[in-house]
Amino acid sequence: MANYIHVPPGSPEVPKLDVTVQDQEEQRCRDGALSLLRHLRPHWDPREVTLQLFTDGITNKLIACYVGDTMEDVVLVRIYGNKTELLVDRDEEVKSFRVLQAHGCAPQLYCTFNNGLCYEFIQGEALDPQHVCNPAIFRLIARQLAKIHAIHAHNGWIPKSNLWLKMGKYFSLIPTGFADENINKRFLSEIPSPQLLQEEMTWMKELLSSLGSPVVLCHNDLLCKNIIYNEKQGDVQFIDYEYSGYNYLAYDIGNHFNEFAGVSDVDYSLYPDRELQGQWLRSYLEAYKEYKGFGSDVTEKEVETLFIQVNQFALASHFFWGLWALIQAKYSTIEFDFLGYAVVRFNQYFKMKPEVTALKMPE
């Protein structure tokens, strides 16, 4: 969903290192990481460097590099997943990272390398579904998302969403079948036909484009593990900007609400109810108006309008990640049931569709 992201003047340049980090064998992975650290932390003794693999990601591999026991200075090395260049524009990702960093919304980006990037580790706890429904935490999340959404486009330029372009690209990349007979049988029986998917995309674009949701700089992938909560400082930070770009404001929130259900063991009974959404959206609108300089008074009508936009755009989120998961099922080397995840997302799309399309905008 990238769309002419402009890096502010004066933003520090990001070095590109001619290093490839192999992630299939532990020793070769370590050798590659140490090659990066020779540039980024030349004072570290390579023999004392600890590498810790984080296992939550389902797009890339993430490794923490540090010396000693305290983890005060940690370099994160993110190795791009196999064929993820089909899904992610890596140049736009770096631009998003730099824009967010310039506005105090992202950690420091140390460098890029041939198959990944390195950045600053944020101290805190990566959240789980039980955290994001806690009012003390979800109000922080709402405010932080509002801060990102309020970032001005360059020179008053009015951005357009690339959601439909990106969705169309993903649709063109979905596999037509799988070599494994059992997987292929499941694919053909449980995934909607390409014709039906095409019809749904056309219908969705017509409905959602008419809702009047502003196009803003969005995170676009605000799952629980991409939110870092620092209890001591009382704040949250978002990480992983590879899907960031200009998109409908309501999509970003609807996508986050879908993520209340989790990723590895999805449970849509955890989708936030109307009361929780009302509190969340009010906190968001108050902060968004403050950041935009519109005061902070929020009416019931504004909350209700955003509620409807968000829940209808949640459909597009299910559809988008359903297509994404089908592509990952074909190419990813990460241990995860991507086909099963696609089934779950498309099933929830069709389950949710009649309920949310029945919602009517307030008079």
Curated annotation (Swiss-Prot):
It is found in: Cytoplasm. It catalyses: ethanolamine + ATP = phosphoethanolamine + ADP + H(+). The keyword GTP-binding does not apply. One of its GO terms (molecular function) is ethanolamine kinase activity. Its EC number is 2.7.1.82. InterPro entries: Kinase-like_dom_sf. GO terms for biological process: phosphatidylethanolamine biosynthetic process. Pathway: Phospholipid metabolism; phosphatidylethanolamine biosynthesis; phosphatidylethanolamine from ethanolamine: step 1/3. GO terms for cellular component: cytoplasm. The keyword Cell inner membrane does not apply. SUPFAM superfamilies: Protein kinase-like (PK-like). Gene3D superfamilies: 3.90.1200.10, Phosphorylase Kinase, domain 1. Keywords: ATP-binding, Cytoplasm, Kinase, Lipid biosynthesis, Lipid metabolism, Nucleotide-binding, Phospholipid biosynthesis, Phospholipid metabolism, Transferase. Belongs to the choline/ethanolamine kinase family. Highly specific for ethanolamine phosphorylation. May be a rate-controlling step in phosphatidylethanolamine biosynthesis. This is Ethanolamine kinase 1. It comes from Mus musculus (Mouse). The lineage of its organism: Eukaryota, Metazoa, Chordata, Craniata, Vertebrata. The gene is Etnk1.
